[in-house]
């Protein structure tokens, strides 16, 4: 990898056989590359193996032409909620209690990332938007040049599927 790449440690664990596994995000020109990481496996403090998903040839196809604030506006318009979690003081207070961080907030600060979409790499703003009404949470990726929504990854799913089950006391139920 060339000098534009760097690694950022984000977690580690010890396996049942005493091997340690260290996970690193891949940074390109200081920005995290979404969905790409490297895992370093060690045994007795020696590197045993390395695996992961990354591209050696990142060619960014856009420039930064809009501000983070403009991108946030595009992301919020895309979600189109009536009410967001950060607008509710009780939700903000609960978050601070759960995390133990008095500065934590649901407000989507956003960050610049590199996102691969259909073999192209884009600089994008990534926002974690948590809507209260209607309930929805998603990572929204906004093209840093055009302001278009490149990708939406929902974090809350629901399903309503009919099924049949054989119950212990009530026989077959649908």
Where are the predicted features?
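Zymogen propeptides/activation segments of proteases
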Residues: 1-174
């Amino acid at each position: 990898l060339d000098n534009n790449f760097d690694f950022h440690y984000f977690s580690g664990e010890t396996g049942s056989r005493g091997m340690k596994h260290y996970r690193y995000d891949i940074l390109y020109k200081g920005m995290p590359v979404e969905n790409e990481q490297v895992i370093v496996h060690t045994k007795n403090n020696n590197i045993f193996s390395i695996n992961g998903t990354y591209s050696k040839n990142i060619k960014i196809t856009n420039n930064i032409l809009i501000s983070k604030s403009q991108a946030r506006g595009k992301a919020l318009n895309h979600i189109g909620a009536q009410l967001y979690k950060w607008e509710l003081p009780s939700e903000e207070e609960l978050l601070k209690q759960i995390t133990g961080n008095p500065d934590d907030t649901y407000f989507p600060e956003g960050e610049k990332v590199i996102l691969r979409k259909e073999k192209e790499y884009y600089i994008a703003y990534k926002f974690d938007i948590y809507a209260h009404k209607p309930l929805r949470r998603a990572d929204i990726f906004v093209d840093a040049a055009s302001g278009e929504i490149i990708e939406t990854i929902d974090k809350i799913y629901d399903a309503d599927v009919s099924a049949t089950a054989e119950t212990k006391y009530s026989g077959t139920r649908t």
